[in-house]
Amino acid sequence: MLEIDWTTEEPALAAGQLLVVPLREGHDPEVISARFGTAVRDAVAKAPFLGKPGESFGFTREQGGAMQHVLLMGTAGLADPAALRQLAHDAAREAQRLGASELLLDLHGADGLPADGDDPLRTGSLLAQGLELGTYVYDRFLSEGNRRTPSLRSATAWGRSAAPADGTARGQIVAAAVAKARDLGNGPPALVTPTYLANTAAEIVDTLRSEGHDVALTVLDREQCQEKGMGCFLGVAQGSDEPPKFIHLAYRPKTAGAGKPTRVVLIGKGITFDSGGYSLKPTDGMLDMKLDMCGAAAVIAAFEAAVRMQVQYEVHSLVAAAENLVSGGAYKLGDVLTASNGKTVEINNTDAEGRLTLADAMVYAASTIHPELMIDFATLTGACIIALGPRIAGVMTNDEPLYADWTAAAARSGEEMWRLPLPGNLKEQLKSKVADMRNTGERYGGAITAGLFLSEFTQGVRWMHVDIAGPAMASKPWGITTPGGTGVPVATILELLAGDIKTTAS
């Protein structure tokens, strides 16, 4: 973790530093001249560096006997949380590339900062998130000679006003949770099994208990899940020799905020490897399926962070963890599975397995926890990526106030969400001749019919479904993400839990 400081006075220069100065398009060239001299101003103009987002201009200078790297970075303004976090992220990345041990981020001349308004805590959080995630790398399986020792140790932000330490600490908690979710997603499937997820949850609980938090863990094995009638979840799991695990993390705050929902349930899809079953995926479609548990990674990581942030909700994270494989014992096309609420489901696609595991988790949440609201997160459908592209999550809900709170949290976090409808007429696609319903609809509207399927298992609880099939994973760097697991939507979950969730159901 970086040592992050804020100051309103210009920091002293030292060797091994990187100074980053954000500039907007249309900036006055004389600003550069006054700060760095006419030679730098002329070189910037010749480059040309205009100050557009994504542009940068770097040089080295000697001052007071110390060599200092300087990077001018273009920005459209820093009031937008995504832009502010991106600036910090890119600055930290460049510091790592240059081998700098200290980063100086000059926000003194930057306009549009939230800190210039009434939310310096948010500014501190966003900057800390960007700085920490700018140092993220998944190198666990690189040999020693191919690993790069991180150089960056500290960062100082110089601004017109200082953000409080609380904001910085909160941002570092959020960043650590995003990084943990990425690590879980990026781990190979032979390592990150259902048992591994359960053990990770146990380690988190042990650590949090040692810090004095009221947390608990329940892990149900196959036999215990059978006793609870989780036929859909166990049907998916039966093709693998790896035992399934149903994970229930619980946190109870010391004090409850007045007028807030008492219990919030976060449910994450936990398919640690998805071959598609007998509806077998092609190789290209299977390569990234170690990441089919990114929903589980998000709710496990967000749980730990929410406890450390001491949110005022009783938070429960649920994961029905399993592998979806092909074997002589795997579930088959035409099978009929019985969910724990008694609904029967005809299987017409074994690659639509995530909704089956979520269904039993939702029934468990409603019947065992009795929450005020529950939200599921799942890399559920390719159809959602086709509809919204790879960077936007699809949201479906039965509750307007909950959706309003969620989208506000997403806007604060800088993660992108878009609502999809739940039209009743499309439920016709889920009708079965031999069971209460089938697990997939027709070709069109696949993301929506998946949401409609899940809506049959809400048991009257306020509910929202977030399809993260696109933004949970990245094939190449974009924004603050690296290839692999992205950690989306951890930041939005934590923004939601840190705020006031409306208690009025629609």
Regions found by a protein language model. Give the residues of each.
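Short amphipathic alpha-helical segment within the helicase RecA-like ATPase core
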Residues: 1-270
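A generic structural signal for tightly packed, nonpolar segments enriched in small/aliphatic residues
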Residues: 197-506
